[in-house]
């Protein structure tokens, strides 16, 4: 009975530690490339590079719209 209790507590502690580490990993600082300023509306958006860089998130006919 005691062994079962100890095992349950150990599993719960490990689960909490795992969630804490995962949460910190999601909030990690982005690399320098990801910190670039976004492109304002009416400016050229480089959708061909595969990354959308418009502040609004919309690129229509290679122009940022929003």
Curated annotation (Swiss-Prot):
Tissue-specific expression: Expressed by the venom duct.
Primary location class: secreted
GO cellular component, one term: extracellular region
Signal peptide boundaries: 1-22
Location in or out of the cell: Secreted
S-S bonds: 38-55, 45-59, 54-64
Keywords of the record: Disulfide bond, Knottin, Neurotoxin, Secreted, Signal, Toxin
GO MF, any single term: toxin activity
Function: Probable neurotoxin.
Domain notes: The cysteine framework is VI/VII (C-C-CC-C-C).
Family, similarity comment: Belongs to the conotoxin O1 superfamily.
Protein name in the entry: Conotoxin Cal6.38
Organism: Californiconus californicus
Origin organism lineage: Eukaryota, Metazoa, Spiralia, Lophotrochozoa, Mollusca
């Amino acid at each position: 009975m005691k062994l079962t209790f100890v095992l349950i507590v150990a599993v719960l502690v490990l689960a909490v530690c795992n969630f804490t580490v995962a949460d910190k990993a999601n909030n990690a600082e982005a690399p320098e490339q990801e910190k670039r300023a976004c492109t304002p509306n009416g400016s050229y958006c480089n959708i061909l590079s595969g990354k959308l860089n418009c502040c609004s998130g919309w690129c229509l006919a290679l122009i940022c719209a929003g």
